[in-house]
């Protein structure tokens, strides 16, 4: 009898667990170091109420006249966010790590990097949201610029 109660309690507890969700974002924005350059990319994420995990790929274009390198990043991130949108806004903070490749002319550097930042997902219609994100990347190794700031806007689909 005691085992039956324990199993029933466990089943009730598991049946009330919150649903996992996933989302995808395509974005375009600007990276600011050493000059403003276009950046674009995508994210894929999944999580529970407050904690989420996402993979992000970003590609910043090279600007030879300003000696500004291209930067490609592949980062795994953890997001801490509000469990639901508040007046249509869902703010979040994020931190992550991964690899980068910086190139300028014939020179390149591939190494490890970390990023920290935050943003907001803005409800538009149904599962479609806008996303505004700010990140600071700290690049290890010998990059031309070891700190890069990025701001983007994107279209986010929650599923």
Predicted regions and their residues:
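Solvent-exposed loop/turn segments connecting transmembrane beta-strands
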Residues: 30-40, 63-70, 104-111, 140-146
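Sec/Tat signal peptide C-region and signal peptidase I cleavage site
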Residues: 16-22
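Bacterial N-terminal signal peptides
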Residues: 7-16
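Predominantly the C-terminal beta-signal and adjacent terminal strand-loop region
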Residues: 125-159
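Extracytoplasmic loops and strand-loop junctions of Gram-negative outer membrane beta-barrel proteins
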Residues: 25-28, 100-102, 138
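Bacterial N-terminal signal peptides that target proteins for export
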Residues: 1-7
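Gram-negative (and chloroplast) outer-membrane scaffold detector with strong preference
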Residues: 45-115, 122-126, 151-159
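Outer-membrane pore/translocation modules
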Residues: 23-35, 148, 152, 157
